[in-house]
Amino acid sequence: MKVLVTGATSGLGRNAVEFLCQKGISVRATGRNEAMGKLLEKMGAEFVPADLTELVSSQAKVMLAGIDTLWHCSSFTSPWGTQQAFDLANVRATRRLGEWAVAWGVRNFIHISSPSLYFDYHHHRDIKEDFRPHRFANEFARSKAASEEVINMLSQANPQTRFTILRPQSLFGPHDKVFIPRLAHMMHHYGSILLPHGGSALVDMTYYENAVHAMWLASQEACDKLPSGRVYNITNGEHRTLRSIVQKLIDELNIDCRIRSVPYPMLDMIARSMERLGRKSAKEPPLTHYGVSKLNFDFTLDITRAQEELGYQPVITLDEGIEKTAAWLRDHGKLPR
């Protein structure tokens, strides 16, 4: 088994490379951060620096030579950005990578998508994989849905390659550069966290190691009998209030911080004002309508299909994941001083 991991220099991809190296699996990693690439090489991975949005066939040939399994973790993930940027990174890059993977004989292609394509500014619990909103919440969600359509078309036209789509919800853990670090910065800098209705929303999260475990399961020969293009929700399997998650992080980081309850309409009004300023300055605002809304609405997933078909069960609990993440932040000097 030889695995190519895209988006390998941070987040999920970085954790995936570490997992595979520890298992003694031959790994080729790709990403844009060459400094991180050198660290991956020290771990035992082969690193090929590349920007998938600018990849050409000669680079793809080198990247995919000898690869039988591809974990496509690379994505432009943001609540803020242009349609062109999302299409380039999430749709076009996925299409070209998938076409090259088929051409070079990749047997398994695991595509990391997002449950953001479910979000519609309403409360939802135990969402199943076939749910679709009347319209997508933002350009990111639309682009991830479009990337799944690309995968579906490739799976129908190329039965020799098995495609699998995973939708992990709210990823977090070591090497995260977005969710937990931003939250920790706000806790330290402001001494309080503003949550709609005090954080009463019921949510799901996914520790990186659990998402990697799901990718590993989906790559096994036992799954070859499953339909190509199959989609699976992935979470920690623990519905929790947002407040309880934030409070657990506050406790583990030992930060003097309070959770303050604010009315959702007021926080949303502030976010919309910031968005208007952001459009004028072309900078991502500290708060967005989408970001604030994700804190307000119940949003949990049903992972029954992954449990029954992949044999997926989380290997790290939510509390363990928060504890491990807090320890990593402390040990690697990632906390504000």
From Swiss-Prot:
Transmembrane segments: none annotated. Disulfide bonds: none annotated. InterPro entries: Epimerase_deHydtase, Lipid_A_modif_metabolic_enz, NAD(P)-bd_dom_sf. Pfam families: Epimerase. Belongs to the NAD(P)-dependent epimerase/dehydratase family. This is Uncharacterized protein YbjS. It comes from Escherichia coli (strain K12).
